[in-house]
From Swiss-Prot:
Domain EngB-type G: start-end pairs: 22-197
Organism: Bacteroides fragilis (strain ATCC 25285 / DSM 2151 / CCUG 4856 / JCM 11019 / LMG 10263 / NCTC 9343 / Onslow / VPI 2553 / EN-2)
Keyword set, alphabetical order: Cell cycle, Cell division, GTP-binding, Magnesium, Metal-binding, Nucleotide-binding, Septation
Residues reported in the UniProt entry to bind Mg(2+): 37, 59
Protein name, per record: Probable GTP-binding protein EngB
PANTHER family: ENGB-TYPE G DOMAIN-CONTAINING PROTEIN, MSS1/TRME-RELATED GTP-BINDING PROTEIN
GO terms of biological process kind: division septum assembly
Gene: engB
Spans traversing the lipid bilayer: none
Obligatory cofactor(s): Mg(2+)
Role description: Necessary for normal cell division and for the maintenance of normal septation.
GO MF terms held by the record: GTP binding; metal ion binding
Binding site for GTP: 30-37, 57-61, 75-78, 142-145, 175-178
Similarity comment: Belongs to the TRAFAC class TrmE-Era-EngA-EngB-Septin-like GTPase superfamily. EngB GTPase family.
């Protein structure tokens, strides 16, 4: 897939105010500081499309970007930022859950995982929740360029082993680096394949 057009449409905290229409939506979510904005900018080829912040957990909005005038890329708030406080964390959880459970246009959720870290309980529990609610999702491992030698392969294998404790069938997964544009083609082709399947129905 070639992205010829990517434009910001709207930010909000209320799923009912998301864009009308039937365009499929591909949402991106992950823990704070997982590299989500950088990944979105890399995928779209637009350096400043999604704002990157030096402060983890700053974004508390659902951001819609219209891609090729045919589908939406949705940037969801990051979860698990402890310094946000209990009230802030509850507010974020409500925004995320309302979008994921109520937004009929959401076609697939991409869960971003920092490839440098060992499996995190918060991510595993979140994916378990997705499974319990029948939400289609894929995993994107980020920051692959930060690991040298065979460390990346070791970390990914460890993560998949952990997932197999919960899942009979593993979700699709992609290995990416925003710095090196690694995984861009694979992720976009995956989105394109789903779009073609939807259009054929």
């Amino acid at each position: 897939m070639e992205i010829t057009n990517a434009e910001f449409v709207i930010s909000n905290t209320d799923v009912k105010k998301c864009p009308a229409g039937t365009f499929p939506e591909y949402a991106f979510i992950g823990r704070s500081n997982v590299g989500k904005s950088s990944l979105i900018n890399m995928l779209t080829g637009r350096k400043g499309l999604a704002m990157t912040s030096a402060t983890p957990g700053k974004t508390m909005l659902i951001n819609h970007f219209l891609i090729n005038n045919s589908w939406y890329l949705v940037d969801l708030p990051g979860y698990g930022y402890a310094r946000r406080g209990q009230k802030g964390q509850k507010q974020i959880r409500t925004i995320i859950e309302d979008y994921i459970l109520e937004r009929e246009q959401m076609t697939n959720l991409f869960v971003l995982i920092d490839s440098r870290l060992e499996p995190q309980k918060i991510d595993l529990e979140f994916m378990e929740w997705l499974g319990e609610n029948g939400i289609p999702f894929a995993i994107i491992f980020t920051k692959a360029d930060k690991l040298k030698g065979g460390r990346l392969k070791i970390n990914i294998s460890a993560y998949l082993r952990e997932l197999r404790k919960q899942w009979e069938e593993l979700p699709p997964y992609f290995i990416t680096s925003s710095e090196e544009r690694l995984g861009r083609t694979e992720v976009l082709n995956y989105i394109e394949s789903i779009n073609k399947e939807l259009n054929s129905k």
